[in-house]
Protein backbone atom coordinates (compact mmCIF):
# COMPACT_ATOMS: atom_id res chain seq x y z
CA UNK A 1 0.00 0.00 0.00
CA UNK A 2 1.98 2.96 -1.25
CA UNK A 3 1.90 6.36 0.38
CA UNK A 4 2.17 9.48 -1.71
CA UNK A 5 3.53 11.31 1.31
CA UNK A 6 3.68 14.55 -0.66
CA UNK A 7 7.04 15.79 0.45
CA UNK A 8 7.29 17.34 -3.04
CA UNK A 9 9.44 14.37 -3.83
CA UNK A 10 8.49 14.06 -1.19
CA UNK A 11 6.26 18.44 9.33
CA UNK A 12 11.25 30.90 23.71
CA UNK A 13 10.58 29.54 27.11
CA UNK A 14 7.08 28.47 27.94
CA UNK A 15 5.06 30.32 30.55
CA UNK A 16 4.97 28.95 34.06
CA UNK A 17 1.56 28.43 35.63
CA UNK A 18 -0.46 30.42 33.08
CA UNK A 19 -4.13 30.33 34.15
CA UNK A 20 -7.11 29.44 32.00
CA UNK A 21 -10.13 30.55 33.98
CA UNK A 22 -8.93 28.61 36.98
CA UNK A 23 -6.97 25.94 35.11
CA UNK A 24 -3.19 25.83 35.36
CA UNK A 25 -0.89 25.28 32.40
CA UNK A 26 2.27 23.36 33.25
CA UNK A 27 5.45 23.81 31.26
CA UNK A 28 6.72 21.10 28.96
CA UNK A 29 9.54 20.27 26.58
CA UNK A 30 10.11 22.35 23.44
CA UNK A 31 8.14 21.17 20.42
CA UNK A 32 9.11 21.37 16.76
CA UNK A 33 8.34 19.78 13.41
CA UNK A 34 10.62 16.97 14.53
CA UNK A 35 10.49 14.36 17.27
CA UNK A 36 13.99 12.97 17.40
CA UNK A 37 17.19 12.81 19.37
CA UNK A 38 18.72 14.81 16.54
CA UNK A 39 16.43 17.88 16.44
CA UNK A 40 16.15 20.36 13.61
CA UNK A 41 16.72 24.07 14.19
CA UNK A 42 15.45 25.23 17.57
CA UNK A 43 11.77 26.13 17.48
CA UNK A 44 9.68 28.49 19.53
CA UNK A 45 7.99 26.52 22.26
CA UNK A 46 4.40 25.37 22.06
CA UNK A 47 2.82 24.20 25.30
CA UNK A 48 -0.42 22.36 24.46
CA UNK A 49 -1.85 22.58 27.99
CA UNK A 50 -4.15 19.57 27.63
CA UNK A 51 -5.48 20.02 31.16
CA UNK A 52 -6.83 23.47 30.26
CA UNK A 53 -9.16 21.98 27.64
CA UNK A 54 -11.53 20.74 30.34
CA UNK A 55 -12.36 24.26 31.57
CA UNK A 56 -15.86 25.16 30.23
CA UNK A 57 -14.99 28.85 30.45
CA UNK A 58 -11.87 28.66 28.31
CA UNK A 59 -13.27 30.65 25.35
CA UNK A 60 -14.48 33.50 27.55
CA UNK A 61 -11.14 33.56 29.37
CA UNK A 62 -9.34 33.78 26.04
CA UNK A 63 -11.52 36.67 24.91
CA UNK A 64 -10.92 38.51 28.18
CA UNK A 65 -7.15 38.19 27.89
CA UNK A 66 -5.66 41.01 25.76
CA UNK A 67 -2.55 38.88 25.22
CA UNK A 68 -4.46 36.07 23.48
CA UNK A 69 -3.49 35.52 19.85
CA UNK A 70 -5.92 34.04 17.33
CA UNK A 71 -4.64 31.98 14.42
CA UNK A 72 -7.12 32.67 11.60
CA UNK A 73 -7.98 29.84 9.21
CA UNK A 74 -10.62 29.25 6.56
CA UNK A 75 -11.09 25.69 5.32
CA UNK A 76 -7.44 24.55 5.34
CA UNK A 77 -5.90 27.92 4.51
CA UNK A 78 -4.28 30.27 6.99
CA UNK A 79 -4.06 34.06 7.25
CA UNK A 80 -0.46 35.03 6.46
CA UNK A 81 1.54 38.23 6.09
CA UNK A 82 4.06 38.03 3.26
CA UNK A 83 5.83 41.28 4.00
CA UNK A 84 9.32 40.19 5.11
CA UNK A 85 9.58 38.10 7.09
CA UNK A 86 6.73 35.77 6.14
CA UNK A 87 4.71 35.07 9.29
CA UNK A 88 1.29 34.16 10.66
CA UNK A 89 -1.12 37.12 10.75
CA UNK A 90 -2.34 36.66 14.31
CA UNK A 91 -5.34 38.72 15.46
CA UNK A 92 -6.01 39.93 18.98
CA UNK A 93 -9.09 39.27 21.07
CA UNK A 94 -10.32 42.82 20.46
CA UNK A 95 -10.72 42.30 16.70
CA UNK A 96 -14.39 42.44 15.53
CA UNK A 97 -13.93 39.17 13.65
CA UNK A 98 -13.21 37.37 16.91
CA UNK A 99 -16.12 38.97 18.75
CA UNK A 100 -18.52 37.71 16.06
CA UNK A 101 -17.12 34.17 15.85
CA UNK A 102 -19.12 31.36 17.47
CA UNK A 103 -17.11 29.60 20.21
CA UNK A 104 -17.85 26.27 18.51
CA UNK A 105 -15.54 27.40 15.71
CA UNK A 106 -12.65 28.05 18.09
CA UNK A 107 -10.03 25.58 19.33
CA UNK A 108 -7.58 26.16 22.15
CA UNK A 109 -4.14 25.33 20.75
CA UNK A 110 -2.29 26.09 23.98
CA UNK A 111 0.41 28.68 24.67
CA UNK A 112 2.75 29.78 21.91
CA UNK A 113 5.76 31.96 22.69
CA UNK A 114 4.33 32.59 26.14
CA UNK A 115 0.86 33.70 25.01
CA UNK A 116 -2.46 31.91 24.80
CA UNK A 117 -3.16 30.82 21.21
CA UNK A 118 -6.59 29.96 19.77
CA UNK A 119 -7.46 28.57 16.34
CA UNK A 120 -10.31 30.51 14.73
CA UNK A 121 -12.02 28.38 12.05
CA UNK A 122 -13.88 30.89 9.88
CA UNK A 123 -16.96 30.02 7.83
CA UNK A 124 -16.21 29.58 4.13
CA UNK A 125 -18.00 32.80 3.15
CA UNK A 126 -16.06 35.00 5.59
CA UNK A 127 -13.69 37.52 4.02
CA UNK A 128 -11.81 39.33 6.79
CA UNK A 129 -10.32 42.72 6.10
CA UNK A 130 -6.78 42.48 7.42
CA UNK A 131 -4.39 44.81 5.58
CA UNK A 132 -1.31 43.09 4.20
CA UNK A 133 -2.60 39.57 4.90
CA UNK A 134 -4.09 36.83 2.73
CA UNK A 135 -5.10 33.17 3.04
CA UNK A 136 -2.49 30.65 1.92
CA UNK A 137 -1.97 26.88 1.93
CA UNK A 138 0.41 25.36 4.45
CA UNK A 139 2.47 23.32 1.98
CA UNK A 140 3.96 26.41 0.35
CA UNK A 141 4.56 28.09 3.72
CA UNK A 142 6.57 25.44 5.58
CA UNK A 143 9.99 26.42 4.15
CA UNK A 144 9.28 30.16 4.56
CA UNK A 145 8.00 30.43 8.11
CA UNK A 146 10.00 30.38 11.35
CA UNK A 147 10.23 26.80 12.62
CA UNK A 148 7.87 27.39 15.53
CA UNK A 149 5.17 29.00 13.38
CA UNK A 150 5.40 26.20 10.81
CA UNK A 151 4.90 23.66 13.59
CA UNK A 152 1.91 25.60 14.89
CA UNK A 153 0.26 25.56 11.45
CA UNK A 154 0.89 21.82 11.10
CA UNK A 155 -0.98 21.37 14.38
CA UNK A 156 -3.80 23.69 13.32
CA UNK A 157 -4.25 22.09 9.90
CA UNK A 158 -4.50 18.61 11.39
CA UNK A 159 -7.36 19.80 13.60
CA UNK A 160 -9.09 21.63 10.74
CA UNK A 161 -9.06 18.58 8.47
CA UNK A 162 -10.37 16.35 11.26
CA UNK A 163 -13.18 18.78 12.15
CA UNK A 164 -14.26 19.08 8.52
CA UNK A 165 -14.43 15.28 8.11
CA UNK A 166 -16.15 14.47 11.39
CA UNK A 167 -19.21 16.72 11.19
CA UNK A 168 -21.46 13.70 11.71
CA UNK A 169 -21.32 10.72 14.01
CA UNK A 170 -19.79 7.64 12.41
CA UNK A 171 -22.09 5.42 14.48
CA UNK A 172 -25.58 6.91 14.05
CA UNK A 173 -25.14 9.80 11.61
CA UNK A 174 -26.26 12.58 13.97
CA UNK A 175 -24.36 15.89 13.96
CA UNK A 176 -21.33 16.19 16.23
CA UNK A 177 -20.51 19.09 18.54
CA UNK A 178 -17.11 20.17 19.92
CA UNK A 179 -16.03 19.59 23.51
CA UNK A 180 -12.73 19.82 25.38
CA UNK A 181 -11.90 23.20 23.83
CA UNK A 182 -12.38 21.75 20.35
CA UNK A 183 -10.22 18.64 20.77
CA UNK A 184 -13.15 16.21 20.97
CA UNK A 185 -16.25 15.91 18.78
CA UNK A 186 -19.23 14.29 20.49
CA UNK A 187 -22.39 12.87 18.96
CA UNK A 188 -25.39 15.06 19.79
CA UNK A 189 -27.74 12.07 19.83
CA UNK A 190 -28.26 11.38 23.55
CA UNK A 191 -28.96 7.70 22.92
CA UNK A 192 -25.63 7.35 21.11
CA UNK A 193 -23.06 9.71 22.66
CA UNK A 194 -20.10 8.46 20.64
CA UNK A 195 -16.91 10.51 20.97
CA UNK A 196 -14.34 11.19 18.29
CA UNK A 197 -10.76 12.37 18.66
CA UNK A 198 -8.38 13.78 16.03
CA UNK A 199 -7.37 11.12 13.55
CA UNK A 200 -3.72 10.26 12.94
CA UNK A 201 -2.65 7.89 10.15
CA UNK A 202 0.76 6.32 10.92
CA UNK A 203 3.04 5.87 7.93
CA UNK A 204 6.60 4.62 7.68
CA UNK A 205 9.27 6.25 5.54
CA UNK A 206 12.56 4.41 5.18
CA UNK A 207 16.03 4.98 3.77
CA UNK A 208 17.20 1.55 2.57
CA UNK A 209 20.94 0.99 2.20
CA UNK A 210 23.14 -1.95 1.24
CA UNK A 211 26.18 -0.20 2.69
CA UNK A 212 27.69 1.93 -0.09
CA UNK A 213 24.36 2.66 -1.82
CA UNK A 214 20.91 3.98 -0.92
CA UNK A 215 17.61 2.95 -2.51
CA UNK A 216 15.28 5.78 -3.58
CA UNK A 217 12.02 5.76 -5.53
CA UNK A 218 9.82 8.21 -7.35
CA UNK A 219 6.10 8.55 -8.01
CA UNK A 220 4.63 9.63 -11.30
CA UNK A 221 3.13 12.80 -9.83
CA UNK A 222 6.46 14.22 -8.67
CA UNK A 223 8.60 16.80 -10.41
CA UNK A 224 10.80 15.29 -13.16
CA UNK A 225 13.98 13.75 -11.84
CA UNK A 226 13.03 13.82 -8.16
CA UNK A 227 13.60 10.77 -5.95
CA UNK A 228 12.85 10.15 -2.28
CA UNK A 229 12.85 7.56 0.48
CA UNK A 230 10.26 4.78 0.27
CA UNK A 231 7.05 5.22 2.25
CA UNK A 232 3.70 3.62 2.97
CA UNK A 233 0.88 3.41 5.49
CA UNK A 234 0.99 1.04 8.45
CA UNK A 235 -1.73 -1.60 8.18
CA UNK A 236 -4.07 -2.77 10.94
CA UNK A 237 -2.44 -5.19 13.37
CA UNK A 238 1.03 -4.46 11.99
CA UNK A 239 4.12 -3.31 13.85
CA UNK A 240 6.16 -0.42 12.48
CA UNK A 241 9.08 -2.74 11.79
CA UNK A 242 6.89 -5.18 9.88
CA UNK A 243 5.47 -2.28 7.87
CA UNK A 244 8.98 -1.26 6.83
CA UNK A 245 9.85 -4.77 5.67
CA UNK A 246 6.54 -5.22 3.84
CA UNK A 247 6.49 -1.83 2.09
CA UNK A 248 10.04 -2.12 0.78
CA UNK A 249 9.34 -5.63 -0.48
CA UNK A 250 6.01 -4.67 -2.08
CA UNK A 251 7.31 -1.56 -3.84
CA UNK A 252 10.76 -2.72 -4.94
CA UNK A 253 11.11 -6.46 -4.27
CA UNK A 254 14.05 -5.71 -1.98
CA UNK A 255 14.46 -7.72 1.23
CA UNK A 256 15.52 -5.75 4.29
CA UNK A 257 16.51 -6.38 7.89
CA UNK A 258 18.11 -4.40 10.73
CA UNK A 259 15.32 -1.83 10.89
CA UNK A 260 16.35 1.18 13.00
CA UNK A 261 14.11 4.07 14.08
CA UNK A 262 15.36 7.56 13.18
CA UNK A 263 12.79 10.32 13.74
CA UNK A 264 9.18 11.35 13.12
CA UNK A 265 7.40 14.22 11.41
CA UNK A 266 3.72 15.17 11.48
CA UNK A 267 2.44 15.63 7.92
CA UNK A 268 -1.23 16.69 7.92
CA UNK A 269 -2.01 16.04 4.23
CA UNK A 270 -4.45 14.98 5.38
CA UNK A 271 -3.51 13.26 8.66
CA UNK A 272 -0.21 11.38 8.41
CA UNK A 273 2.45 10.92 11.05
CA UNK A 274 5.64 10.01 9.22
CA UNK A 275 7.81 7.57 11.20
CA UNK A 276 11.31 7.49 9.77
CA UNK A 277 13.61 4.46 9.68
CA UNK A 278 16.89 3.23 8.30
CA UNK A 279 17.00 -0.37 7.04
CA UNK A 280 19.70 -2.64 5.62
CA UNK A 281 19.07 -4.53 2.39
CA UNK A 282 20.37 -8.09 2.07
CA UNK A 283 18.78 -8.78 -1.35
CA UNK A 284 19.17 -5.83 -3.68
CA UNK A 285 17.60 -6.50 -7.12
CA UNK A 286 14.81 -3.98 -7.78
CA UNK A 287 11.50 -5.32 -9.08
CA UNK A 288 8.76 -2.69 -9.32
CA UNK A 289 5.14 -3.63 -8.65
CA UNK A 290 3.56 -0.63 -10.38
CA UNK A 291 3.11 1.60 -7.32
CA UNK A 292 6.29 3.53 -8.13
CA UNK A 293 7.32 4.92 -11.48
CA UNK A 294 10.94 4.07 -10.75
CA UNK A 295 13.28 2.95 -7.98
CA UNK A 296 17.03 2.75 -8.19
CA UNK A 297 20.22 2.50 -6.18
CA UNK A 298 22.27 5.65 -5.75
CA UNK A 299 25.97 5.68 -4.94
CA UNK A 300 27.10 7.80 -2.02
CA UNK A 301 28.85 10.32 -4.25
CA UNK A 302 25.74 10.74 -6.40
CA UNK A 303 23.74 11.88 -3.38
CA UNK A 304 26.55 13.98 -1.89
CA UNK A 305 26.76 16.02 -5.09
CA UNK A 306 23.06 15.91 -6.04
CA UNK A 307 21.27 19.18 -6.74
CA UNK A 308 17.95 20.22 -5.24
CA UNK A 309 16.00 18.93 -8.25
CA UNK A 310 16.88 15.35 -7.31
CA UNK A 311 16.45 15.44 -3.54
CA UNK A 312 13.28 16.01 -1.49
CA UNK A 313 13.02 19.48 0.12
CA UNK A 314 15.15 20.22 3.20
CA UNK A 315 12.16 20.49 5.55
CA UNK A 316 11.03 16.89 4.93
CA UNK A 317 11.94 13.83 6.93
CA UNK A 318 12.87 12.14 3.64
CA UNK A 319 15.68 14.66 3.15
CA UNK A 320 16.86 14.25 6.73
CA UNK A 321 17.02 10.49 6.31
CA UNK A 322 19.21 10.90 3.24
CA UNK A 323 21.44 13.46 4.94
CA UNK A 324 21.83 11.31 8.04
CA UNK A 325 22.92 8.36 5.89
CA UNK A 326 25.50 10.52 4.11
CA UNK A 327 26.75 11.78 7.47
CA UNK A 328 27.08 8.25 8.84
CA UNK A 329 29.09 7.20 5.79
CA UNK A 330 31.36 10.24 5.60
CA UNK A 331 31.30 11.98 8.97
CA UNK A 332 30.21 15.18 7.20
CA UNK A 333 27.58 17.45 8.71
CA UNK A 334 24.60 18.07 6.34
What is the predicted role of each segment?
Residues 3, 15-18:
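Leucine-biased recognition of intrinsically disordered, low-complexity hydrophobic segments
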Residues 7:
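Cationic, low-complexity basic patches in intrinsically disordered or flexible, solvent-exposed regions
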Residues 17, 22-166, 177, 223-227, ...:
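Nudix hydrolase/Nudix homology domain
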Residues 108, 119, 168, 186, ...:
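Conserved hydrophobic/aromatic beta-strand scaffold that supports enzyme active sites
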Residues 265-287:
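Active-site-adjacent beta-strand/loop module that shapes the phosphate/pyrophosphate-binding cleft
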Amino acid sequence: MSLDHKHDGDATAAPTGLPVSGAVCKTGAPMSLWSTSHPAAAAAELERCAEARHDPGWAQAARADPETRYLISRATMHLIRREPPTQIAFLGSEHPLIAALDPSRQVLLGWFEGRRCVLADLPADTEPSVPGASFEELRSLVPLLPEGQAQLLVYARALLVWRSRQRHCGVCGAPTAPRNAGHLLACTNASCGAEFFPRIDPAIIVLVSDGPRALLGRQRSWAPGRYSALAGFVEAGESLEDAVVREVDEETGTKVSWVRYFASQPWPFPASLMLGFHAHAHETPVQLDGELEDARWFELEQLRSADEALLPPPYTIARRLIESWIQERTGEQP
